[in-house]
Amino acid sequence: MNYYVGIDGGGTSCRARIRNQQGEWVGEAKSGSANIMLGVEVALRSVVDAITQAAEQGGLSPDDFPSMHVGLALAGAEQKEAWHAFMQQAHPFASITLNTDAYGACLGAHLGEEGAIMIAGTGSCGILLKGGKQYVVGGREFPISDQGSGAVMGLRLIQQVLLAQDGIRPHTPLCDVVMNHFNHDIDSIVAWSKTALPRDYGQFSPQIFSHAYCGDPLAIELLKQTAADIEMFLIALHHKGAERICLMGSIAERIQDWLSPPVQQWIVKPQSDAIEGALMFAGKPEHNLYKDGL
């Protein structure tokens, strides 16, 4: 029997879902980061770990991997060099098809029909599928892109907290959260920043939301800025022809109330998720982002 696996991999986690050839659910699991820009070996290891755990739920084992066609919707796959490096790795599966996490999410959100999505989680990216073509805005990775993401919001938070420590801007309760995290040691923040990954900055986003709802001025400022960034991408997608846009990801799903009313009118609920989108192209090499790979 053949099995089909959908993978949704981002900067924070990798989620796997297995279905049999009748489309019946077999198992689902989550592992670590699968952003291929952070290392193709790490990403493949996370993929295999998630599939292994999901397989166990359905009474399967690694012996069944050669019967599995895997659709990979991974962050960072838009980078051609990284895409090729990932695809050149040895793997135990029947086939792998690799496209971006945004592509998988858009397919899932509109069940394969035309439409657009705006993803904002650890990273951010907007994508429109229309007329057989793919249009992308943003998504060029932290720190040079990914506006509207948890990572950029967390970076801005750290910057503002340091300004508050210097007496340049007012200190708020949200500043205390960050300083407590680093044991009130600015040198620790500086040292941490030298190796901090997008998910490390993104870890502060839940606190930003909760403090904004409590009226914290800094948190409100950060959310307004994040909403403006996301709205910028939504307008760009609309100009490219998007009539229906789904908000996806931990930040985007919570930011809708912060968007302007005209923009909110374009928002629709996703019909499914990125894992289902990845399942749609499992075993279908024509969905590979680049066609000259292995």
Curated annotation (Swiss-Prot):
Optimum temperature is 40-42 degrees Celsius. CDD domains: ASKHA_NBD_GspK-like. Keywords: ATP-binding, Cytoplasm, Kinase, Nucleotide-binding, Transferase. Substrate binds at D101, G139, R140, E141, D146. Its main location: cytoplasm. One of its GO terms (biological process) is phosphorylation. GO terms for molecular function: ATP binding; glucosamine kinase activity. It is found in: Cytoplasm. It comes from the Bacteria. Optimum pH is 7.5-8.5. GO terms for cellular component: cytoplasm. Its EC number is 2.7.1.8. It catalyses: D-glucosamine + ATP = D-glucosamine 6-phosphate + ADP + H(+). ATP binds at T12, T122, G202. It is an enzyme of class 2 (transferase). ATP-dependent kinase, which is specific for glucosamine. Does not show kinase activity with any other sugar. Belongs to the eukaryotic-type N-acetylglucosamine kinase family. This is Glucosamine kinase GspK.
